[in-house]
């Protein structure tokens, strides 16, 4: 995992050695937290996480390509009713057709998913590199027409649950 092409710095050169463990779908043992993982649709695999908080549940679902019911339906069940969801909105609807199979979604799919699954707050992230703040503001505005409580995640965004 800590080697090319997945990571730019070899493990032996890291100043601090992080503990790494494989996580499987299902209950995840994180002391002090109630965490569940679910497989997502992405080449090479990816997991979504649902973390139960005192004031609601947080779902983090990066690297997911909508369009395969065998992944989309379990994700809907997994995320339904969450207070907050963070979803991969890498592409615009216009860009997505040229990138089928890449394992990413567009902002419209994310807004429709959040609206149809009773999710209180949607945060779009995994923005395409080079997309300007102005373009992201336009995406946010468009997505809010489908799911009012939508925002675009940015560096240092914090969410309390």
Regions from the language model: what does each represent?
Residues 1-59, 65-70, 75-76, 133-161:
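Binuclear metal-dependent hydrolase catalytic cores
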Residues 59-60, 124:
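Structural beta-sheet core signal
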Residues 67-155:
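Cap/insert and terminal regions of metallo-dependent hydrolase folds
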């Amino acid at each position: 995992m800590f080697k090319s092409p997945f990571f730019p710095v070899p493990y032996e050169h890291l100043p601090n050695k992080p503990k790494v463990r494989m996580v499987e779908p299902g209950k995840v043992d994180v002391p002090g937290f109630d965490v569940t993982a679910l497989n997502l649709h992405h080449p090479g695999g990816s997991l979504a996480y649902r973390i139960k908080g005192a004031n609601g549940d947080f779902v983090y679902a990066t690297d997911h390509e909508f369009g395969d019911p065998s992944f989309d339906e379990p994700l809907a069940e997994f995320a339904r009713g969450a207070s907050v969801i963070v979803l991969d909105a890498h592409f615009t609807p216009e860009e997505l057709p040229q990138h089928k199979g890449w394992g990413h979604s567009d902002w419209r799919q994310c807004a429709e998913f959040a609206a149809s699954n009773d999710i209180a707050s949607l945060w779009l992230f995994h923005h395409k590199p080079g997309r300007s703040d102005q373009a992201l503001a336009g995406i946010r505005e468009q997505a809010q027409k489908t799911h009012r409580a939508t925002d675009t995640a940015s560096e240092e965004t914090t969410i309390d649950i």
